[in-house]
Amino acid sequence: MPLNVSFANRNYDLDYDSVQPYFYCDEEENFYQQQQQSELQPPAPSEDIWKKFELLPTPPLSPSRRSGLCSPSYVAFASFSPRGDDDGGGGSFSTADQLEMVTELLGGDMVNQSFICDPDDETFIKNIIIQDCMWSGFSAAAKLVSEKLASYQAARKDSGSPSPARGPGGCPTSSLYLQDLTAAASECIDPSVVFPYPLNDSSSPKPCASPDSAAFSPSSDSLLSSAESSPRASPEPLALHEETPPTTSSDSEEEQEEEEEIDVVSVEKRQPPAKRSESGSPSAGGHSKPPHSPLVLKRCHVPTHQHNYAAPPSTRKDYPAAKRAKLDSGRVLKQISNNRKCISPRSSDTEENDKRRTHNVLERQRRNELKRSFFALRDQIPELENNEKAPKVVILKKATAYILSVQAGEQKLISEKDLLRKRREQLKHKLEQLRNSCA
């Protein structure tokens, strides 16, 4: 970077001739026209190259409720034109007005347009800082805001005497805020379309005392106390007071989200006080809200076989004493069942161990009996009678051969027996013949 600075401090014609091959040959695009006219030091070549790589402006946000204040016409009117006769003249701005204008300048399209370099702008001529892709946009935005604030202060000084002291209800900027709100009401979405349920009953102004309001006073007090004790802040009223400055679109969206979430909590916490009011005052039962009671039941009903993931973490304080006792008894029963479940696995483990032990004993007995039978078979075979280390396969083979040989000897002996029987029969018959001949 120091090389570029020293390089730019030399003669401009020689420098441009030396770095001319680095630029595009385009006659329509002249980077240094403004510098040549004003006879200022030219920027480094990298400065204009980074212009081609600047990021596009961010997408626009939701339409602000004060769209009139964001427009350049309103800014010019508010800063340079005098107010009406009722305001006391002068374009003076309070601290809230300046902060609001700064926030809208930072979030609006004027700053986004400032990121794109305009060669006819004064800031392009005076900008001698070597730009960087990270810091050039922020410096331009800060410079634009400071220039706008300086113009506002100059307009305030030139406008004349400051406006007289304003009371809490006579702020002209607040009247302009309300006028802008009414003018931009067509651009905004009706909250009743997004939130069909009543958002905040406690924020509405309380009417005169009536029997209906007296009947529901405990529930409203309990709602207020629960809203104050809740970790989240209570929802702000929708009606803007005169001294409250209008919020931006992002703030309004966050307030709507908080109001929606707190509305769900208030519907859940509204059920026990309503029951108490119905049981305590039977006369007010006819004036109870019929459309809201089924809604509360539908939103608070949770099936027993499902887990309510959207429920608050601790719901024990919402239940009465009877339900607490039932919950405690149910927890005790669950603990007992869990203990039984814990005991039953132990008993099943012992049973499995006993079965395994008896199986091992029976298997050992079977192996011992099989070994004894093999030893007995080995003793019956003449070839393996004295061989104590004979394997079982050899014992089985030798036993099979010995049995076959024994069966063959048996058949031979049976045939010899038959021959001897026949011989005996023949000899007996011959002896009988000799006895008969001698007689």
From Swiss-Prot:
GO molecular-function terms, A-Z? DNA binding; DNA-binding transcription factor activity, RNA polymerase II-specific; E-box binding; protein dimerization activity; protein-containing complex binding; RNA polymerase II cis-regulatory region sequence-specific DNA binding
Q: Where is this region: Disordered?
A: 201-296
Please give the SUPFAM superfamilies that the UniProt record associates with this protein: HLH, helix-loop-helix DNA-binding domain (SSF47459)
The Phosphoserine modification is found at: 6, 62, 71, 81, 151, 159, 161, 293, 314, 329, 344, 347-348
Q: Where is the composition biased (Low complexity)?
A: 207-238
Residues listed as glycosylation sites in the UniProt record: 58
Q: Where is this motif: 9aaTAD?
A: 100-108
Boundaries of every bHLH domain copy: 354-406
Report whether Phosphoprotein shows up as a keyword of the record: yes
What post-translational modification information does the record give?
Phosphorylated by PRKDC. Phosphorylation at Ser-329 by PIM2 leads to the stabilization of MYC. Phosphorylation at Ser-62 by CDK2 prevents Ras-induced senescence. Phosphorylated at Ser-62 by DYRK2; this primes the protein for subsequent phosphorylation by GSK3B at Thr-58. Phosphorylation at Thr-58 and Ser-62 by GSK3 is required for ubiquitination and degradation by the proteasome. Dephosphorylation at multiple sites by the PNUTS-PP1 complex promotes MYC stability by preventing ubiquitination by the SCF(FBXW7) complex. Ubiquitinated by the SCF(FBXW7) complex when phosphorylated at Thr-58 and Ser-62, leading to its degradation by the proteasome. Ubiquitination is counteracted by USP28 in the nucleoplasm and USP36 in the nucleolus, both interacting with of FBXW7, leading to its deubiquitination and preventing degradation. Also polyubiquitinated by the DCX(TRPC4AP) complex. Ubiquitinated by UBR5 when not forming a heterodimer with another bHLH protein, leading to its degradation: UBR5 recognizes and binds a degron that is only available upon heterodimer dissociation.
Q: In this entry, which stretches build a coiled coil?
A: none
Q: Which SMART domains match?
A: HLH
Q: Which UniProt keywords apply?
A: Acetylation, Activator, Chromosome, Cytoplasm, DNA-binding, Glycoprotein, Isopeptide bond, Nucleus, Phosphoprotein, Proto-oncogene, Transcription, Transcription regulation, Ubl conjugation
Query: Cross-link Glycyl lysine isopeptide (Lys-Gly) (interchain with G-Cter in SUMO2) - where?
Result: 52, 143, 148, 298
Q: Which superkingdom heads the taxonomic lineage of this protein's source? A: Eukaryota
Q: Cite the record's Basic and acidic residues compositional bias ranges.
A: 266-278
Q: Which residues carry this modification: Phosphothreonine?
A: 58, 315
- What coarse category fits the chief subcellular location reported for this protein? nucleus
Task: Please give a single GO biological process term from the UniProt record.
Answer: positive regulation of fibroblast proliferation
* Motif UBR5-degron positions after renumbering to this chain: 355-364
In terms of Pfam families, this protein maps to: HLH, Myc-LZ, Myc_N
Q: Which GO terms describe its cellular component?
A: cytoplasm; nucleolus; nucleoplasm; nucleus
Q: How does it assemble?
A: Efficient DNA binding requires dimerization with another bHLH protein. Binds DNA as a heterodimer with MAX. Interacts with TAF1C and SPAG9. Interacts with PARP10. Interacts with KDM5A and KDM5B. Interacts (when phosphorylated at Thr-58 and Ser-62) with FBXW7. Interacts with PIM2. Interacts with RIOX1. The heterodimer MYC:MAX interacts with ABI1; the interaction may enhance MYC:MAX transcriptional activity. Interacts with TRIM6. Interacts with NPM1; the binary complex is recruited to the promoter of MYC target genes and enhances their transcription.
What's noted about domains in the record? The 9aaTAD motif is a transactivation domain present in a large number of yeast and animal transcription factors.
Q: Could you identify this protein by its name?
A: Myc proto-oncogene protein
What organism is this sequence from?
Answer: Felis catus
Gene designation per UniProt: MYC
